[in-house]
Amino acid sequence: MGELMAFLLPLIIVLMVKHSDSRTHSLRYFRLGVSDPIHGVPEFISVGYVDSHPITTYDSVTRQKEPRAPWMAENLAPDHWERYTQLLRGWQQMFKVELKRLQRHYNHSGSHTYQRMIGCELLEDGSTTGFLQYAYDGQDFLIFNKDTLSWLAVDNVAHTIKQAWEANQHELLYQKNWLEEECIAWLKRFLEYGKDTLQRTEPPLVRVNRKETFPGVTALFCKAHGFYPPEIYMTWMKNGEEIVQEIDYGDILPSGDGTYQAWASIELDPQSSNLYSCHVEHCGVHMVLQVPQESETIPLVMKAVSGSIVLVIVLAGVGVLVWRRRPREQNGAIYLPTPDR
């Protein structure tokens, strides 16, 4: 089980980070049911997150809800964990029944998955979002609209369930209240519990270097590491213009020390005199590394400290560093396949 969670948790983190806005805090619960699981895979798993931090886990092997963050264990009494353990044991059985029913409807056999995701987000301006959805075999199945108190069904099987669920007005109102009120209240409480971890800022250390990726092909790599929160924007510009279609991006990944790393690369045109610059934005600070045209080694390393850019090392050429504060405009909720309610 430990090996499986070691695989699942970073994967979910990567998915969340790729869609998150740095000004948003979120609480999400993911649940996964598996029919006919392979050896070592639990038939039911539940994981809770605040932002990209796992806070709770439950699985059908341990049959216990447990804290994944020390500040959760320190602030919630034993009866909390016991109460939600009992609820999740009920969810485990419910998932098993629902998955069997779906397999009958689809005439499926063998191993299949049923997923639930529920959560909420608190934006910097105080506004909130809430989301609840189900998936079958990794594909959207039912999506809740809390404003219209209705479910969006993706096929005829889902439509049958939609009709039954929408007939229960009390449950629809309960889900709406949980998303808009309870979830946000829990999120604010957890943010206070873990504020030293969740609300800190660690600026990125950014490097640019050249690398021969294939014989005769050279690329520029812009690498950022040691940053938190994990949301970061990186791009390359050629002669002052962004060239997204020419850029390769790496995923934003945990570094193992509570910080994150990411990279973006672009292939060099050896026949041109193009001027390349890497642009990195993190927590409102915008950094620019301009690459010296004749450099053959690592041209730049820099780090943002307390809202300003500090040149740490310059090798084989002089770089141009620019900084300014700029608000992020992108905004969006994260919809991933589950809550402990």
Swiss-Prot record:
5-(2-oxoethylideneamino)-6-(D-ribitylamino)uracil binds at residues 31, 46, 65, 116, 174-175. SMART domains: IGc1. Disulfide bonds join 120-183, 222-278. GO terms for cellular component: early endosome membrane; endoplasmic reticulum; endoplasmic reticulum membrane; external side of plasma membrane; extracellular space; Golgi membrane; late endosome membrane; MHC class I protein complex. Residues 202-293 are annotated as: Alpha-3. Residues 110-201 are annotated as: Alpha-2. N-glycosylated. Residues 324-341 are cytoplasmic. Changing residue 72 to P: Markedly decreases expression at the cell surface likely due to protein misfolding. It is found in: Cell membrane; Endoplasmic reticulum membrane; Golgi apparatus membrane; Early endosome membrane. Changing residue 112 to Q: In allele MR1*05. Residues 1-22 form the signal peptide. Changing residue 39 to R: In allele MR1*02 and allele MR1*04. The chain crosses the membrane at residues 303-323. 8-(9H-purin-6-yl)-2-oxa-8-azabicyclo[3.3.1]nona-3,6-diene-4,6-dicarbaldehyde binds at residues 31, 65, 80, 116. Glycans are attached at residue 107. Pyridoxal binds at residue 65. Keywords: Cell membrane, Disulfide bond, Endoplasmic reticulum, Endosome, Glycoprotein, Golgi apparatus, Immunity, Immunoglobulin domain, Innate immunity, Membrane, MHC I, Secreted, Signal, Transmembrane, Transmembrane helix. It is a single-pass type I membrane protein. PANTHER family: MAJOR HISTOCOMPATIBILITY COMPLEX CLASS I-RELATED GENE PROTEIN, MHC CLASS I-RELATED. This is Major histocompatibility complex class I-related protein 1. It comes from Homo sapiens (Human). The gene is MR1.
